[in-house]
Amino acid sequence: MKETIYKQLEKVREASRKLCTLSDSDINSLLNDLANRIPGNSQTILEANQKDLDRMDPNDPKYDRLLLSTSRLESIASDIRNVAELPTPVGRILEKRTLPNGLALKKTTVPLGVVGIIYESRPNVTFDVFALCLKSGNATVLKGGSDAMYSNMAIVDLIREVLVRNNVNPDTLYLLPSDREAAGIMLNAVGYIDVIIPRGSQQLIDFARKSSSVPVIETGAGIVHTYFDLSGDLQMGKEIVFNAKTRRPSVCNALDTLLIHRERLDDLASIAEPLAEKKVIIFADKDAYPALLSRYPSELLQKAEEKHFGTEFLSLKMSVKTVDSLEDALKHIARFSSMHSEAVIASDAVVKDEFLKRVDAAVVYANTSTAFTDGAQFGLGAEIGISTQKLHARGPMALQELTSYKWVIEGDGQTRA
């Protein structure tokens, strides 16, 4: 298998070197062609997706991530069109100056080269990643999970067909076999792949980080907190907590832990009331539990254990922790946060400013839902992932994060003494 994969990766590397010959207009035309062909191929894609769904327990938190539908495919097509409309990130001049010796120097953005994505469940990622990589001049190597095998194969077949129709080398995109051996080969394909971006569970991300000899950009798990301050508006709190927890509980920006100021415990039942409609299970600490007892459905209320803090639930479950102050909330977040998205609900400007300044996360919010941590919501088009690390990229990663830069120097015969 290793030899076969390396031969294909060499073709991908060669294809990546030719992408610089495509104009931005060529790329945009190809992306729009792909978006326009999704509806006509939706039946084939959805049938393949159903084969994957049939192999998964509907109660599995990953089921919703795996699920495609006509409306989701329409949304994907719209996202691809949005990417086509964005300005190219390649060729931007970051710095430009003339040195004392007359050399003209400029720093300009260039593609990373070959981008490898290892991911689980989400077949929409196949479309998103290809669109972003092509727009930024990169070739793409995909390693999807076995749970989305049929979906990914159908999507890649469509994309490669569109590449050929637009006179672009189909080796610009390569889908690896879905088994674990292929993942190991990919993670050590130095010289073939320039960067690996894992998307999925913390287990997958840890595996990629520890096993890879290719540079890795982590798109970390989301252990997401919202702190309801002493000065928080009750109605705002109800709406934000409900949205952050229930909009799409299986995604990484969904709320996991509500921190509530001790002096607002009397309002906890009101904040939690809408959650009962969605049958959200609450793990409440020793102070929050009595505040919810008899005011929240007993079958949905449990006493919290230490393990419930620092857990990414990815389902209709959440924990509640009582804190005595903003300082306590900050300490709890510092201990359990995955540095993804954190929010505060407060009217006190000092509290808001202190929270936004001191919380170490890729995205911090005041008086709004963490559900907005998303490349499309940020106006970036589709996203490649949400990075929780600090080097190269942080937060929603889109086109700009798929580029590096090089120095271009022009002279008229200068030599160095």
Swiss-Prot record:
Keywords, ordered alphabetically: Amino-acid biosynthesis, Cytoplasm, NADP, Oxidoreductase, Proline biosynthesis
Pathway membership, UniProt: Amino-acid biosynthesis; L-proline biosynthesis; L-glutamate 5-semialdehyde from L-glutamate: step 2/2
Main location class: cytoplasm
One biological process term in Gene Ontology: L-proline biosynthetic process
Protein's UniProt keywords contain Oxidoreductase: yes
Localization, UniProt: Cytoplasm
Enzyme class: oxidoreductase
CDD domains the record matches: ALDH_F18-19_ProA-GPR
Family: Belongs to the gamma-glutamyl phosphate reductase family.
Single GO molecular function: glutamate-5-semialdehyde dehydrogenase activity
Name under which the protein is recorded: Gamma-glutamyl phosphate reductase
Coiled-coil ranges from the UniProt annotation: none
SUPFAM superfamilies: ALDH-like (SSF53720)
Function: Catalyzes the NADPH-dependent reduction of L-glutamate 5-phosphate into L-glutamate 5-semialdehyde and phosphate. The product spontaneously undergoes cyclization to form 1-pyrroline-5-carboxylate.
InterPro entries linked to this entry: Ald_DH/histidinol_DH (IPR016161), Ald_DH_C (IPR016163), Ald_DH_N (IPR016162), G-glutamylP_reductase_CS (IPR020593), Glu-5-SA_DH (IPR012134), GPR_dom (IPR000965)
PROSITE patterns in the record: PROA
Catalytic activity: L-glutamate 5-semialdehyde + phosphate + NADP(+) = L-glutamyl 5-phosphate + NADPH + H(+)
UniProt GO cellular component terms: cytoplasm
EC number(s) from the headed UniProt entry: 1.2.1.41
